Amino acid sequence: MFGFKKEKATAFHAPAVIDAIESAVYAAVKPLGFQKHGRTLHRFVSGDISQVINFQCGQAIRGDNHLMWVNIGIRVPECDLRSFQPEDPLKKHYHEYDCTIRTRLGAVRGKAETTYDLRKPTDKIIRDILSQLQAYVLPVFDILSSREAILEKRRE
């Protein structure tokens, strides 16, 4: 009516932000043997022990879809099986919820879980995730890369 142009609001799109974060993290851990499966980065060590990094977004229905957590897990097949005679062949990959040992970024180093606000600068989030992965998660994954090491550390 008056010729004023209405500025279009920039919509926040959490999946696109998580895609960017996940791509950067994957580029850093791919040389270490991780493969991408949806929102999960997975690798096998010692043949069949899974090590998992998973990106979890909040739920829109709860109003926290702008938040993200990084889940960390290790799956030891013998601890996941429900019978003494395993019949299922090894899967191509496992998810964080399949893991025997589970935690979140932040808790790995004995602090509170790290929650990321996806409305903040993406490059800052990526730097923090990579920093925590390199300083705390990957060293733990290196230590807990065999059944013997997992049992030894669990006894401590």
Where are these regions (language model features)?
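Pyridoxal 5′-phosphate
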Residues: 29
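Intrinsically disordered, low-complexity regulatory regions enriched in serine/threonine/proline
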Residues: 2-20, 24, 36, 43-156
